Amino acid sequence: PVAEATTAVGRFTILETIEKCKSIEIEVLYGDTDSLFLKGPTREQIQKIVDWAKEEFGVDLDLDKEYRYVVFSTRKKNYLGVQKDGKVDVKGLTGKKSHTPPFIRKLFYEILEILSKVQSENEFSQSKQKVGDMISQYAKNLKARQIPLNELAFNVMISKAPSEYVKTIPQHIRAAKLLEQTREIKKGDIISYVKIINKPGVKPVEMARPDEIDSAKYMEFMESTFDQILSSMDLDFSTLIGAPKQTGLDQFFWN
């Protein structure tokens, strides 16, 4: 198969490049199918590798990003990196998605702000404590149903009229059908709904009560949103909210 052959060639090139880096005393921190993370190489060393790859394999290597620091999780391919301008990269970010409830999105950006200011390993350790405390406090507020309903809302645009959904009915359409009891709902409308403990599992924000909120469902969404960041910091969501900790060690590399 072509895909397998292409993957094999890519893997071979990466492995050979790793060996070449070692031969000119560049420390390779991590490599996958299409990238390498190198610890503090000089411009001259980078150019040597670029020239070598072009001559040896006809491959153009580019310096993609320069990180102030990067943290690799014990989980395969999970990492967190902060570029020199303070921009935070975390593989598989979900906190930026437009339908993410405001309270989770707010926490997400607060965490990125903390990480972007880290300038040393000691500050990184302090940031872990801050991040852990923040998530723990948000979780407590969620369990106590102290977060305003509008902050819990999933905001989704409907692509067609609710009546056009027959077989599979998404959650935002279930909420839209409830809203139809009070007003007309049409294609293009934004439906704001919250997750509740009783059927049908969701309610429009304007029809919901705080005591109906399914805090467990929101906790699951919090965990899935922050899993990549936390695993890269050797923090465990379950531990932060009071459950047993999973073991793991992070690897910190400063440039």
Q: Can you name each region flagged by the protein language model?
A:
Residues V2-T33, L38-N255:
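DNA-dependent DNA polymerase catalytic subunits
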